[in-house]
């Protein structure tokens, strides 16, 4: 939610306010250069004096946001330049570089039905000129040790985001041609970075993805692939494979 709605800080700033933005401590470095923010503090740290307060997720209501007025900039976050350069060298190689993630936060109610198994990427991994790179952290990453025979996915290991939430993920994503992910924070991160991203959605997704549309008014760089039937992912990945095959090499 923070990555999606921190964009409203600029709108508040444009009204003439000095914006003090309080976010989860792990996100402070990621958001340190966010446009419109005068002071960025970690949740729980002492607050400076302020005149007004508004919960971040109430800002869409405060600005009377509707479908036609969603602030949908091409991008509003930027990865650290040194990390971008480091990961560019780390993942260098031929082919279309596709970052993948398949598992959301385990054991939470929101995760029911939204995650899928890594092995569903097998047919995409087998395509010519495709290099899959894992963006998965924590639970779910153990599937990298038990992939179908012949399936290759680059594992970035414990080094990824060792210094803070999403710092390396943002840098890796900046170097990718495409991200394919389940409905996780990585979808929001890639969208906020303006990187071409395909999101696989369960049959009844979260409210923010709406219904009956392939685009997202929140993130212009996203394309949504929806389940046709509950708990059925095969058709989603079949369509992705078709779409990748239809992309001329070098034009993604």
Where in the sequence are the language-model features?
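Catalytic machinery of carbohydrate-active enzymes
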Residues: 2-252
